[in-house]
Amino acid sequence: MVNRQLVSPKSIVIVGGSDDTKKPGGNTLKNLLDTHYSGELFVVNPKADSAQGVRSYRRIEDIPPVECAILAIPAKLCPDTVDVLCTKKSCKAIIILSAGFHEDSPEGAELERRIAQRCNETGTSLIGPNCIGVMTPDYAGVFTHPIPKLTRQGAALISGSGATIVFILEAAMQLGLNFSQVFSVGNCAQIGVEEALQYMDESYEEGKSSKVIMLYIENISDPWKLYRHASSLIRKGVRIAAIKAGYSEAGSRAASSHTGAMASPDKAVDALFRKAGIIRCYSRNELVTVASALMYPTPKGKRFAIITHAGGPAVMQTD
């Protein structure tokens, strides 16, 4: 479930934030500062009283109530930290950047299960683990670069792969594409592509929400939910382009080792996308190109011209 505290938090704590911008916690803090996050900002670091000029608390128990927490600490420390945040600090949104969970080992899967259970019990939104974070017009809660221009009517991006987000942002920014929201869902312990899409459907406002949504999917855990909300958005005038990776046998194995994704038969994926109206793409460059084109109004009628420097590109454009 995606809530207001995840999308527009009034206060954020970086657990594991530091002066070291080569580490996820330190660079996430730097990104928040560089993009002028306007809410209250705290750090938890047992070895520091401040980080990049922001007050740091030695223990999670010492912080004031906070709306959103970004965790960049070892996986084994996350469950107890989440317990304190959810039960004692009124925290309703948690982003876990750390890896070492379901994608790594049975022991990691148990840590992830405990975290998801606590978040579900307390009505807390959970992104990750094993992700790069979240970006909205209100904050850039990620440890990566680049940070795109974030506007409410830019394209939205939901991805199970953090590195794919970085590639897409770099390519899209060269084409002048702006973004409204970026969700790196990682292992999808609670919120996956389907749940993020549900949020975009249920919060859609004509003239204010994104008209283009980009998806990178490794696992479709709830095909009906994906279909229901994708088709609903498309009926509202939103256009959706998606990559479903892991469609080959070898790719499916790679997806499983990456985020713990389960295989989905490729013919079923094709049928689902066609029925919903999702445009399927097969590469990151194709996804960026398609999304950039979709940002323009839909051409009407048959008075359409193609101008190129040579014949071959004209033939391909005609196709």
State the predicted function of each range.
Residues M1-D319:
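Catalytic-core regions of core metabolic enzymes
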